[in-house]
């Protein structure tokens, strides 16, 4: 790796999580000679009460739409043009909804220098003709750069409020993982680096499906014992899925990192997927309607990931091996009754 400092950082995305990460990076780079002191952040331009969102961020230093109430450091510069934002960047932090990754990579392919490094904070997967494709694989293929991943029990508003949490960086090149740890770690944002990157990334995507099931249980007022069963059986399906679909060997220890069981717990109790799934049961409205009503422009990942997982499992004739993942998809998209989530627990293969 021939990166010469100070390294220029660009954050590709500026939603709730992207803005929280921008706050960390903006503060950290001020005190480190290794990194350039200005941080570019690509912002999908929106109009907020007659003003451009980039203008608000650059003058008031707050993302009033996606992270209100938290000041961003003044060295974080919002740019509406993606190509301008990534120009000359050495380190790219990808933090956008997973459904936009193809479009973003196509736009900046060939515009980033060959020694640049990426890290994806995107929780989701893609499916192609060969089945599973990880978001990091898409970035790697389209951008021709090395990509690490960061996943963990990180509810963005709590991270922005500097409440203590942990996270996991997965990097097949340990030195690249350690470089991103240096950029991102703070006393209240503690990072472990592991080499089992594909498992780290899969955990971040699959836990959102389990959180939807947890939200269904909350909507049905099932109680904490049932939710604990959803979390445990969901974790078992996550492990089984990783064992089938990961190209490299899977370490069970990775599921004990923040990206695994910790992220699963926090998402099943505090995340947006759980919240919307509970409302789905109580209101009878569609997932799409609730996303528009409840999330202030943010995207829901769990239902869409369940659909992608379902199609991947169909290709392998393995739908019946993953009853919880399947039930979430069928309830969200095929009109199956929400109570099916309970019957899938009752007859789960783990009990047979």
Swiss-Prot record:
One cellular component term from this protein's GO annotations in UniProt: cytosol
Record-linked SUPFAM superfamilies: 6-phosphogluconate dehydrogenase C-terminal domain-like, NAD(P)-binding Rossmann-fold domains
Role noted for this protein: Plays a role in regulating cardiac sodium current.
GO biological process, alphabetically ordered: carbohydrate metabolic process; glycerol-3-phosphate catabolic process
This protein's name: Glycerol-3-phosphate dehydrogenase 1-like protein
Binding site residues for NAD(+): 13-18, 156, 272, 299, 301
Keyword field contains DNA repair: no
GO molecular function terms attached to this record: glycerol-3-phosphate dehydrogenase (NAD+) activity; NAD binding; protein homodimerization activity
Range of residues in the leader sequence: none
Keyword list, A-Z: Cytoplasm, NAD, Oxidoreductase
Active-site residues, as the UniProt record annotates them: 207 (proton acceptor)
Localization terms from the record: Cytoplasm
EC number: 1.1.1.8
Organism from which the protein derives: Xenopus laevis
Family: Belongs to the NAD-dependent glycerol-3-phosphate dehydrogenase family.
């Amino acid at each position: 790796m021939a990166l010469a400092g100070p390294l220029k950082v660009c954050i590709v995305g500026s939603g709730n999580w992207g803005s929280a990460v921008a706050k960390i990076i903006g503060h950290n780079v001020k005190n480190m000679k290794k990194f350039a002191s200005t941080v570019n952040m690509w912002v999908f331009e929106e109009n907020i009460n007659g003003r451009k969102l980039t203008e608000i961020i650059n003058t008031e230093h707050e993302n009033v739409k996606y992270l209100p109430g938290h000041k961003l450091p003044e060295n974080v510069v919002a740019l509406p043009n993606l190509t301008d934002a990534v120009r000359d960047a050495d380190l790219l932090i990808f933090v956008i909804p997973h459904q936009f990754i193809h479009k973003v990579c196509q736009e900046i392919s060939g515009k980033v220098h060959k020694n640049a490094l990426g890290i994806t904070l995107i929780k989701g997967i893609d499916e192609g003709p060969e089945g599973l494709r990880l978001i990091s694989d898409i970035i790697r293929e389209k951008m021709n750069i090395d990509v690490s991943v960061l996943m963990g029990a990180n509810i963005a508003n709590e991270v922005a409020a500097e409440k203590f949490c942990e996270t996991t960086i997965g990097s097949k090149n340990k030195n690249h993982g350690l470089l991103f740890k240096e950029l991102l770690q703070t006393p209240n944002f503690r990072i472990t680096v592991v080499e089992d990157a594909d498992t780290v990334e899969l955990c971040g995507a699959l836990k959102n499906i389990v959180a939807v099931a947890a939200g269904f249980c909350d909507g049905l007022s099932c109680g904490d014992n049932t939710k604990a069963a959803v979390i445990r059986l969901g974790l078992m399906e996550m492990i089984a899925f990783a064992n089938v679909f990961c190209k490299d060997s899977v370490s069970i220890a990775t599921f004990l990192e923040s990206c695994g069981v910790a992220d699963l717990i926090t998402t099943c109790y505090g995340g947006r997927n759980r919240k919307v799934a509970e409302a789905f049961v109580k209101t009878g409205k569609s997932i799409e309607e609730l996303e528009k009503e409840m999330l202030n422009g943010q995207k829901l990942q769990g239902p869409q990931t369940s659909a992608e997982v379902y199609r991947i499992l169909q290709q392998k004739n393995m739908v019946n091996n993953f009853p919880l993942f399947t039930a979430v998809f069928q309830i969200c998209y095929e009109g199956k009754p929400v109570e099916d989530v309970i019957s899938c627990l009752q007859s789960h293969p783990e009990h047979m």
